[in-house]
Each structure stands twice: as structure tokens, then as C-alpha cells.
């Protein structure tokens, strides 16, 4: 580079800005003497070297072949990137014309032969003459036939309805496809797969493009649907086959070049770079030829990095190269090649300059290290990374690359030479000069920055990056047609070998730096272009199918975020290309969305570094997303929803949607949903179809466009109405749409349950169940139940209770026959989006909401959190007398619980057979044995209870109480009645049990006895069943429940109880008191009349009575407090006294002197003796 050109550039550090020190070691390495350099003065040597500058080593012819191969491949990739997904004959013809011109140029040497020579030189392996000649001959034939096909395609384009043009293009297509099928094996000859690899890749690319035409034009050519499908399936099969072959043999060739020396690394990296450009970049585009997946223009991006050769002088005559004494292969690989990382771009550079000198007239200032500044897509944060050394510097140089693409660099790798003494020389390799050619990303203006600290008397070699990464051939200047931009700069540094060599990393220009989503095109954003990655998320290297690195998410917390710009208002779908070793769920959040997607396992039993083409699949977010035009950044986060071993994200795709497309999609979805309801004969419902699914299908039909599809909508509505009729007809539940809760037939429910009209989750009416009610210290569950009578059931048949839960906490669901089935549902309220979609008028868009609900339901798993439920229940032998039927019930026992549910149905699933029938028959036998025991137990307790009740009466009509009946007889009978089991259902006490009738019969008779007893006792409320009613008491007196008996408690000596009541004059009465005294002192019950005639009964603790122990059976339900034993201590006594009076009023007073006084009953009854 001439210093006379400095006025054209911005020169940085043409002279040192600071001067710190020279290198401390002047001659770290002295070379062994050579014949050429012994006794030679350095000035003579410099003169000898002058004029022999060679930019690149090796044969010029070979280098030109390599450059031509790379340039042709870059041109092809550029043409392919601009023509992806364009399904029109004009652009396709134009693309084919350009590809043919590149691959079969009108020059003497074959481009295919250049491809062969390129790889031969890279791996130092010649293709056998027979294989080369055969391949070149067949490629020539393919070129001729491709031209004929292109001609036929152009003629058909001009005359699409002409029979000859149509026949010719179809024939030429079939012939060319047959030739590719026949000739492709010639491009992968055994033992020559690697040197043939570029040829194979380019031929495979042409074949796949050809097969794509069958999908694009096949219908217009008159091909049958099955023929088109066959071509499409072949294209998909060959895409995988060709891709896997290319990647496999690329990796094989690269692995063979691994070595131990720096020179071997140079060869290794050159193979990696050039084969990425000629093979992997082409393979990465194969997936985009799938017209069913990519029917529109598609923007694809290549995010892989390639590294140009390290910037050190090489092959200096009689001196050598920088890599002759340099770090090892593995050290250079580690230092120069970045590990997989989030895609970034360079924004600034600080170069650290050191000086190596021999004399004041012979020295080199060189690039000794640097700090690079870079950003991730869409972020404002700047990251920095240090390379090389920043110690003992001469100067620092700062470069600002903000908003610029560096499309080219010119660098000087130099050597500084000194003859230490005759026969010994000292050489130092460094990089003293670089020019950065830049173009502004915003306004296309150009600028050049130069790093050039002063050096003197050095031998330099110019390195032009465009010779390794040429621009596309477009007729435009290179600042417009450049193919790559500088992305990063690494460094090979070793103080021990005195190695200071920068390495430039480049990214393809197709990698957009803003993640702009274009309107009207499918925009692909590679996973590596995420702005941030979360915990348990990392970047892994792609194998070549993907054009760049991948994002790997693991466990529940793995996540990544993308930042994008939408310059125009758009409507689109989101699709993800991925690979995973298990089936699970991911969540999407952003763009006013929050949803979950289920993904299926795509591979197993292999490492993520061994993935093949078919290990990658697609999942699609079902909702159409709308965004408004904005220059602001929009965010989309993707995370793992469940514990997942590995989810590998290749790319996200934004697929534009117009109203017609969305309407067509809605119609197809509605058709699919409605058809799925019916059997093949369309005269019945599919066995597994639920009432909720019928309603959801109806919602989809309602959302169809009346303008575009009026007839289809009408017909689908007729079908879904029939499905609803069939669903209702098979449902054995009464009042399934909750018209009358607690009516004569149907549902019985607790208070507080609401009936809600339909919404986006429920089309029809549904119920909202509140939590259990708390009143004082008691908790009253919320319940809902219904009985299906025995008469509508079939023997030995399985039925199923089904329904849908919008959300719930602690909802218990039961089916009850001879046994009880119970499930508990805790269902999250996650079916509706956080931000409701709205129409242009601001109202909620119910159809969009409905799609969101459907998408959520498609990915939910079958667990306690699932919204749908299904409980089987089997019938055996029917007993119409017992009429057990089937009870269905819902209950919430937690005050904090809640539930919304609807679409309840009990349907017949089918007759039992096989193991299920055998199992039920065994259970039925066990049930009969159990029922026999229950009946025996019932008979015993019922007879004891009935006898106790019979003894209460003096007649058979239960009209007169036995005169000797005391309150203890009544309570004893009551306890026996309460001990009768199976009166109510164990889970729902409101549901009658097998002994409900007997229990009710005895309870009614006992209630009659209590009534007669109350009539007989002249003292109102003498048994305290009505608490303190009728009694005058002081504040400390209370009534307690002891042994299921109401007991009056006088706790202190200063408390009193009294009552005035009416009696019949001149009638003899007996005062009978049942009480006990605790502690010291006495308890008194006194009675007097208007004439102050009185009687007193005295109770003390010494009235101990061993008969004071009671055996009570207090429950009438299974498992509730049965056979409990109570003891009242120290004594319970019953004392009587006779009294009569001429007055019609009497007074009774109760008191005590100390301790506590318990009174169970005070009776004043007519003395019948």
C-alpha cells in the first residue's frame, strides 16, 4: 500500500500516539544458517526479495480454480436466497437461466471441473481419471437437457394452453428427472466422495429445484394429484438423502485434515471455509424448496461464521511463514475459532500496538492485541472481549464501526529481518497495517478506516479479503454486491513463540442485523439470533442443515428471547423448526400473545451433534397474530413449560396471512372439527366425542365468513345441529343445561351455585360453584348431585361421566353405584389470553378468543390439571327393587375452593366383555357378600331400635306414651336409631342410603314420642332441647351437649335458674329430676305453689352411680362416630318427689352452693298410681 493514497482514507495511527517501550528481548529466535543467507547482508536480502511479492502461496492456476469455485458458489447461493419460495414461472425461469450460466458457462474450462480441482487441492487427493471423465460427461449431458427443459418451460410460459408446449415441458421434465436419478451416483463414487462433494451438492441442488416444479406447475401440466404427491414425496426423501450425504462427507473430509501443526490448521480452516461456501450454504437452503411449507417468497438467513486466513506473512522467499514457529493446531483452533454463541455484530475496535526494532532505521510497529466491541440483535448493551496482549504498548488505536458493514479488508502481513551475525538470522512476523472498507447500513455511504502505525524496512505481503470471500457477480460495485461482512476478530497469540496474528471472522450478508419481519414474505429468524438466552439454555453448533448455530433449551426454566422490528402492520402465523428427544411443551410469550405449544419427539438414542436432516420437524402456533407498524422493538420469548431433556430450536418463521387465507383456514378447521364428530357413515357420533367438542365445533362454524362461505356455513351448521341432537339424545342426565336447579327432576344443589350464560370457554350454560360456607364453627360443603334411575340402565355395561372444567380448586367429582369413584380437579384458569383480542370497534373478538381456547386445549396433557374429565362406571346385574341407579355428584369442601363446569353428560360406552366383564363379575360377588353382611347388621340394629321405640308407647297406634317412660328411655331409643348404618351416602349425606326408609320410619315414631312426652311434662322445655327457652337464668348459666343430650349447667353458687308454669289444681304430680353434682356443696331443685307449699330435691357428689356409663351409637352414616363410649362423672342421679296443689301455678327453682351442677331433665308429670 502506498502512503501517497492517504488522503483518500481516514488514517489512524500513521505515527505512534504514545511511546512506552521497545521489546525487551531483541533476538528471541535466531534461525539456523542456510546456504542462501550465509554471509548475506540484510540490505542485499531486501533487494533480493523486492519484486517477488506474492499475495497467496501455491500455484496461481490452483488458486484461481479455488477462487472461481468459491465465487461461483457464492453467486449461486445469492441467486437462491433471492428466489426462495417464489411460485411463479417467470422468476423460476430467470433463476434457472442464471444457474445454468454459472454452472455451464460459455468458456472453455468446465465449472464442474473447477469444483473438482478445488477440493482436490484442499485435501490433496486426485479423482481417478475414469470417475472424473464419466462425471464430466454426464454433467455435460445434464446441462444440455437442463437447457432443453428451460427452453420448453419458457415456451410453455408464453403459451400455457398450447398442447404441444404442454407436452414438451412435461416430457422434458420427466426426462431430466430420470437423468438426475441415473447420474447422481456418479458424483459420489466410492473413495472419491469428498473430492466430488461440491459437484454432488450442486447437482443435488438442481435436482431438488427440478422436483419442486412438479408441485408448483404439476396441476397446470395436467399431472394427477397422486403423481404430484409422488414427486413431492420423492423431493422430501431426496432432500434428506442429499443433505445427509453432503454433511457426512464434509465432516469426513474435515476430520482427515486434523493435525498438530499450525500449517495443518491453515489447510484445515481453508477446507472448512471453502466447503462451507460451496457445500453447506447450499445444503442449508434445501428445506426451503418445500412448496407446501414455503408457498410464498421466503427470506432465509445464513448465520454461520467463516474465518479468512490468519493475517501473517506466508511463503516469504528464503524466510518462510509466520506459522513455521507458531502454537500448535489445537491451540490455534481454541484461540482463533469462537465457540457456538448468540449471533452478534461488531461495533468497535481498539487495537494495541507494540514495537519490535533492530535499529532506529529498522523496526516494525505491529498489532499485538485488541479489544472488540459487539452487540446482540435488538439490544442496546455493548459487550467487549480482549484478545492478545495490552502490556508494554507503543500506542492504542480506536475504530468506531457503528452502523457500518465492513465488506472488505486489505491487510499487510510483514516480516522484520536481521542478520545477527553471518550464518544466523533473526525474523519477526507481525501485522502492521490494515484498511477497513465500510459502507453505511442506513444511507449506503462509504468510508475507509486504516490502522497503520509507522514501520521501516520491513517485508510485507498484502492480503485482500475479497480474494477469499469474493462479492457476488452482479454488475454492481463491490460495496453493493459484497457477500460477507466482518463480524468479529480473534487473535492467535503466544509470547513463547512470539506469535501475534489477527484472524478475521465473517458472517453472510443475508443475516439481517435488526431481525426485521417483512410483510408479504415468510421471514425466517434463526435461533442463534436470539437476543438473550436464559438459564439452562445454551448455543450448540449446527451440522450444516441449518446455516448456523442452534439454541438448546433444557428443563422447565430453559428460555430465549427474540427482538424484532415490524416496519409494516401485519397479520401472520408463527412456525418453529426444531428437534427434540422427547415430547413436551413450550410456551410463547410476547406480541400480545401467551400460549403453549406441544412438540413431539423427533429423534432418540443419539447425541445432538449427530442429528440428521429428518430429525428436524415443524410446530405451528395456531393463532393468527396481528401487529401494528412500528420502528420499536417487539419481543417474543420461548421457554420450556415442563421438565424437558432437550429442545433444539433451529429457527422461528413468520408466515403472512391475509383475510382470504385466514377464512380458508377457518373453513378447513371447521370442516375437520365437524367431520371428526361423526362416524364414517355420518349417522352417529364417534364414541369418544364429547358434548364439549360438539359445542366447540359449533363455535368454529359460527366464526366462518358469511360473505365468502354462506353455503358451507349453512351445511356445516346443519351437521353440527344434528351432532348436538345426537349428543343430547345419548345423555342420561336430566337437565344437562341447568334450566332448573333443585327442581322436581334433575339436579339437587346447595345454595350459592350460579348458572352462567355461555362465553368463549363454554358455548352453553355452565355452573359456577363457590367454596364451602363457613357458619360459626361449622363448614358446609358446596354440592351438586343427580341420580340416574336403574330403569334407564343396561346390565353389564360401561357408562362414562364426562364434562369440562373451566377452572377449579378442590373440585371433587364422584360417580356412585355399589362403589364410589372419585377424582379431584385443580384446573388452572389458563384458557383465555391475558390480553383479550379486540375487533376494530374495540369489542372482544370472540372468534380469536375461541381459537386461543382451542390451541390451549390441543396441547394440554391428561392430568389433574386437564380441563376435560372422564370417569367410567360399570353396571352389573340390575335390581329394579333396590334401584341403586348411578349417582353423579360434585363437591367442594374447602372454603377457598371454586369451580366452573359444564357440558356434563353420562353416556353409554358399550357392553362389558373380556377381562372387564370378568373383573366386574368378581366384584359383584364380593358386593353381594358385603350386602348380605350389611343387611344382617341392619336387621340387628333396626330390631333393637324398633323394640326400644315400641316400649315407649302404651298402644299400637302410637297415640299414648307409656306412663313409665322417662327421658332416658327416649334418649336411649334415639341413640339406638342413630346407630342404624347406611342411612345416607358416605360422600354426600344428602343422598339417601339403603336404610333411609327404616331410619325415617323410626325417627318419625320417636318424634311422636317426644311430642307426647313434651305434652305430658307440665314444665315447658324441661329437657333443655330448646336451650334456655322458658327459663329465667343468670348470665353464667348455659346449656351444653353432653352425650348427645342437652344438659343445663350451673357453674357457680351465685347462679340461679327458675320458671313459672301452669298446672291443673288438685292434681297429684310427680317431680322427677335427673342430675349430677360435681365438687363440694349441694345442688337443689325446689318446687312451690302459690301457697308457699314447697318440696326440694338435693344432689351431691356422693350420689355416685355406676350406672352413669352410657354406650351410645351416635351416627347414622358409615364411619361417623359410631359405638362411642361416654361417661359422666362422678354420678348421675334420678330423684323424685310427689306434690299436689290447689293452685293453677307453680314455680321451680334450681341452684347450688358450690362446685358445678348438671341437670339433664326436670319433669312434672301426672301421678297415675
UniProtKB/Swiss-Prot annotation:
The entry's protein name is Pesticidal crystal protein Cry8Ba
Q: Which gene encodes it?
A: cry8Ba
What are the record keywords, sorted? Answer: Sporulation, Toxin, Virulence
Q: What is the lineage of its organism?
A: Bacteria, Bacillati, Bacillota, Bacilli, Bacillales
SUPFAM superfamilies (UniProt xref): delta-Endotoxin (insectocide), middle domain (SSF51096), delta-Endotoxin (insectocide), N-terminal domain (SSF56849), Galactose-binding domain-like (SSF49785)
Matching Pfam families, A to Z?
Cry1Ac_D5 (PF17997), Cry1Ac_dom-VII (PF21463), Endotoxin_C (PF03944), Endotoxin_M (PF00555), Endotoxin_N (PF03945)
- Would the keyword Electron transport be found if you checked this record's keyword annotation? no
Q: What this chain does, per the record? A: Promotes colloidosmotic lysis by binding to the midgut epithelial cells of insects. Active on various scarabaeid beetles.
What else does UniProt say about it?
Toxic segment of the protein is located in the N-terminus.
UniProt superkingdom: Bacteria
- Annotated region (Disordered), positions in chain: 1-26
Entry-linked InterPro entries? Cry1Ac-like_dom-VII, Cry_V, Galactose-bd-like_sf, Pest_crys, Pest_crys_dom-III, Pest_crys_dom_I, Pest_crys_N_sf, Pest_cryst_cen_dom_sf
Amino acid at each position: 500500500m502506498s502512503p501517497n493514497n492517504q488522503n483518500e482514507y481516514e488514517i489512524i495511527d500513521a505515527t505512534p500516539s504514545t511511546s512506552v517501550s521497545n521489546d525487551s528481548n531483541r533476538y528471541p529466535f535466531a534461525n539456523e544458517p542456510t546456504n542462501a543467507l550465509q554471509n548475506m547482508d540484510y540490505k542485499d536480502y531486501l533487494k533480493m526479495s523486492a519484486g517477488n511479492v506474492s499475495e497467496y502461496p501455491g500455484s496461481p492456476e490452483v488458486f484461481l480454480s479455488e477462487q472461481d469455485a468459491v465465487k461461483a458458489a457464492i453467486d449461486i447461493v445469492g441467486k437462491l436466497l433471492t428466489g426462495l419460495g417464489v411460485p411463479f414461472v417467470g422468476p423460476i425461469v430467470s433463476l434457472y437461466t442464471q444457474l445454468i450460466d454459472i454452472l455451464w458457462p460459455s468458456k472453455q474450462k468446465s465449472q464442474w471441473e473447477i469444483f473438482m480441482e478445488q477440493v482436490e487441492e484442499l485435501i490433496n487427493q486426485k479423482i481417478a481419471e475414469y470417475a472424473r471423465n464419466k462425471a464430466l460427461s454426464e454433467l455435460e449431458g445434464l446441462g444440455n437437457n437442463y437447457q432443453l427443459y428451460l427452453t420448453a418451460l419458457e415456451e410453455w410460459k408464453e403459451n400455457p394452453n398450447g398442447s404441444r408446449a404442454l407436452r414438451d415441458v412435461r416430457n422434458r421434465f420427466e426426462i431430466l428427472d430420470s437423468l438426475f436419478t441415473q447420474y447422481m451416483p456418479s458424483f459420489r463414487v466410492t473413495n472419491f466422495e469428498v473430492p466430488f462433494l461440491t459437484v454432488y451438492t450442486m447437482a443435488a441442488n438442481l435436482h431438488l429445484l427440478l422436483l419442486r416444479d412438479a408441485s408448483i406447475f404439476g396441476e397446470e401440466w395436467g399431472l394427477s394429484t397422486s403423481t404430484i404427491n409422488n414427486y413431492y414425496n420423492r423431493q422430501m426423501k431426496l432432500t434428506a438423502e442429499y443433505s445427509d450425504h453432503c454433511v457426512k462427507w464434509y465432516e469426513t473430509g474435515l476430520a482427515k485434515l486434523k493435525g498438530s501443526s499450525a500449517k495443518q490448521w491453515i489447510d484445515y480452516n481453508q477446507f472448512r471455509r471453502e466447503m462451507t461456501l460451496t457445500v453447506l450454504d447450499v445444503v442449508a437452503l434445501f428445506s426451503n424448496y418445500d412448496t407446501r411449507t414455503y408457498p410464498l417468497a421466503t427470506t432465509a438467513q445464513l448465520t454461520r461464521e467463516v474465518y479468512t486466513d490468519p493475517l501473517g506473512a506466508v511463503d516469504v522467499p528464503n524466510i518462510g511463514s509466520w506459522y513455521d514457529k507458531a502454537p500448535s493446531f489445537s491451540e490455534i483452533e481454541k484461540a482463533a475459532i469462537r465457540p457456538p454463541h448468540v449471533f452478534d455484530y461488531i461495533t468497535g475496535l481498539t487495537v494495541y500496538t507494540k514495537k519490535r526494532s533492530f535499529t532506529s532505521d529498522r523496526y516494525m510497529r505491529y498489532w499485538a492485541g485488541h479489544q472488540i466491541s459487539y452487540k446482540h440483535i435488538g439490544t442496546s448493551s455493548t459487550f467487549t472481549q480482549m484478545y492478545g496482549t495490552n502490556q508494554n504498548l507503543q500506542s492504542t488505536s480506536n475504530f468506531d464501526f457503528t452502523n457500518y458493514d465492513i465488506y472488505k479488508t486489505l491487510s499487510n502481513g510483514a516480516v522484520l529481518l536481521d542478520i545477527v551475525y553471518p550464518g544466523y538470522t533473526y525474523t519477526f512476523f507481525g501485522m502492521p497495517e490494515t484498511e477497513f472498507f465500510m459502507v453505511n447500513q442506513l444511507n449506503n455511504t462509504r468510508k475507509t478506516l486504516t490502522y497503520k502505525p509507522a514501520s521501516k524496512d520491513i517485508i510485507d505481503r498484502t492480503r485482500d479479503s475479497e480474494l477469499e470471500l469474493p462479492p457476488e457477480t452482479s454488475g454492481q460495485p463491490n460495496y453493493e454486491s459484497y457477500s460477507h461482512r466482518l463480524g468479529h476478530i480473534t487473535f492467535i497469540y503466544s509470547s513463547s513463540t512470539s506469535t501475534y496474528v489477527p484472524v478475521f471472522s465473517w458472517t453472510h450478508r443475508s443475516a439481517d442485523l435488526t431481525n426485521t419481519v417483512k410483510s408479504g414474505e415468510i421471514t425466517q429468524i434463526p435461533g442463534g439470533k436470539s437476543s438473550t438466552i436464559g438459564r439452562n439454555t445454551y448455543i450448540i453448533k449446527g451440522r450444516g442443515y441449518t446455516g448456523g448455530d442452534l439454541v438448546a433449551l433444557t428443563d422447565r426454566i430453559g428460555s430465549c428471547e427474540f427482538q424484532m422490528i415490524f416496519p409494516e402492520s401485519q397479520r401472520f402465523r408463527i412456525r418453529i423448526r426444531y428437534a427434540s428427544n422427547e415430547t413436551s411443551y413450550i410456551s410463547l410469550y410476547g406480541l400480545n400473545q401467551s400460549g403453549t405449544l406441544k412438540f413431539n419427539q423427533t429423534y432418540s438414542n443419539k447425541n445432538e451433534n449427530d442429528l440428521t436432516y429428518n430429525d428436524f420437524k415443524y410446530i405451528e402456533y395456531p393463532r393468527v397474530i396481528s401487529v401494528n407498524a412500528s420502528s420499536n422493538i417487539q419481543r417474543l420469548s420461548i421457554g420450556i413449560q415442563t421438565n424437558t431433556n432437550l429442545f433444539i430450536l433451529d429457527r422461528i418463521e413468520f408466515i403472512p396471512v391475509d383475510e382470504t387465507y385466514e377464512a380458508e383456514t377457518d373453513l378447513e378447521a371447521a370442516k375437520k372439527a365437524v367431520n371428526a364428530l361423526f362416524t364414517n357413515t355420518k349417522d352417529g357420533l364417534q364414541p369418544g366425542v364429547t358434548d364439549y367438542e360438539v359445542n366447540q365445533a359449533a363455535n368454529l362454524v359460527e366464526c366462518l365468513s358469511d360473505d365468502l362461505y354462506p353455503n358451507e356455513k349453512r351445511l356445516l351448521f346443519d351437521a353440527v345441529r344434528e351432532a348436538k341432537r345426537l349428543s343430547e339424545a345419548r345423555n342420561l342426565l336430566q337437565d344437562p343445561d341447568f334450566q332448573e336447579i333443585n327442581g322436581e327432576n334433575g339436579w339437587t344443589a346447595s345454595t350459592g351455585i350460579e348458572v352462567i350464560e355461555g362465553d368463549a370457554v363454554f358455548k352453553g350454560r355452565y355452573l359456577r360453584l363457590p367454596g364451602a360456607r363457613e357458619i360459626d364453627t361449622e363448614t358446609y360443603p358446596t354440592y351438586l348431585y343427580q341420580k340416574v334411575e336403574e330403569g334407564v340402565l343396561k346390565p353389564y355395561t360401561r357408562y362414562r361421566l364426562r364434562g369440562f372444567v373451566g377452572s377449579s380448586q378442590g373440585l371433587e367429582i364422584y360417580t356412585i353405584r355399589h362403589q364410589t369413584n372419585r377424582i379431584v380437579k385443580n384446573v388452572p384458569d389458563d384458557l383465555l389470553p391475558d390480553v383479550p383480542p379486540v375487533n376494530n370497534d374495540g369489542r372482544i373478538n370472540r372468534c380469536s378468543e375461541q381459537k386461543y381456547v382451542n390451541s390451549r386445549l390441543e396441547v394440554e396433557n391428561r392430568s389433574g390439571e386437564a380441563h376435560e374429565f372422564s370417569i367410567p362406571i360399570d353396571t352389573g346385574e340390575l335390581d329394579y327393587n333396590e334401584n341403586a341407579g348411578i349417582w353423579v355428584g360434585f363437591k367442594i369442601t374447602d372454603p377457598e375452593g371454586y369451580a366452573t363446569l359444564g357440558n356434563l353428560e353420562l353416556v353409554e360406552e358399550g357392553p362389558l366383555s373380556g377381562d372387564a366383564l370378568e373383573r366386574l363379575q368378581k366384584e359383584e360377588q364380593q358386593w353381594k357378600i358385603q350386602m348380605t353382611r350389611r343387611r344382617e347388621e341392619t336387621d340387628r340394629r333396626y330390631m333393637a331400635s324398633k323394640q326400644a321405640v315400641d316400649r315407649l308407647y302404651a298402644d299400637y297406634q302410637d297415640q299414648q306414651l307409656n306412663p313409665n317412660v322417662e327421658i332416658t328411655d327416649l334418649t336411649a331409643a334415639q341413640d339406638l336409631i342413630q346407630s342404624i348404618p347406611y342411612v345416607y351416602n358416605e360422600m354426600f349425606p344428602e343422598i339417601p342410603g339403603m336404610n333411609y326408609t327404616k331410619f325415617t320410619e323410626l325417627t318419625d315414631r320417636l318424634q311422636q314420642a317426644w311430642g307426647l312426652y313434651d305434652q305430658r311434662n307440665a314444665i315447658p322445655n324441661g329437657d333443655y332441647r330448646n336451650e334456655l327457652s322458658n327459663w329465667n337464668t343468670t348470665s353464667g348459666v348455659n346449656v351444653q351437649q353432653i352425650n348427645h343430650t342437652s344438659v343445663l349447667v350451673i357453674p357457680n353458687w351465685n347462679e340461679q335458674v327458675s320458671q313459672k308454669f301452669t298446672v291443673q289444681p288438685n292434681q297429684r304430680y310427680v317431680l322427677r329430676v335427673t342430675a349430677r353434682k360435681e365438687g363440694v356443696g349441694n345442688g337443689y331443685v325446689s318446687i312451690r305453689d302459690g301457697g308457699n307449699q314447697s318440696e326440694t330435691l338435693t344432689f351431691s357428689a356422693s350420689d355416685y352411680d355406676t350406672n352413669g356409663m352410657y354406650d351410645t351409637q351416635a351416627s347414622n352414616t358409615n364411619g361417623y362416630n359410631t359405638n362411642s363410649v361416654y361417661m359422666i362423672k362422678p354420678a348421675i342421679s334420678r330423684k323424685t318427689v310427689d306434690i299436689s296443689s290447689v293452685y293453677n301455678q307453680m314455680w321451680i327453682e334450681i341452684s347450688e352452693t358450690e362446685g358445678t351442677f348438671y341437670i339433664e331433665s326436670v319433669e312434672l308429670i301426672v301421678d297415675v298410681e
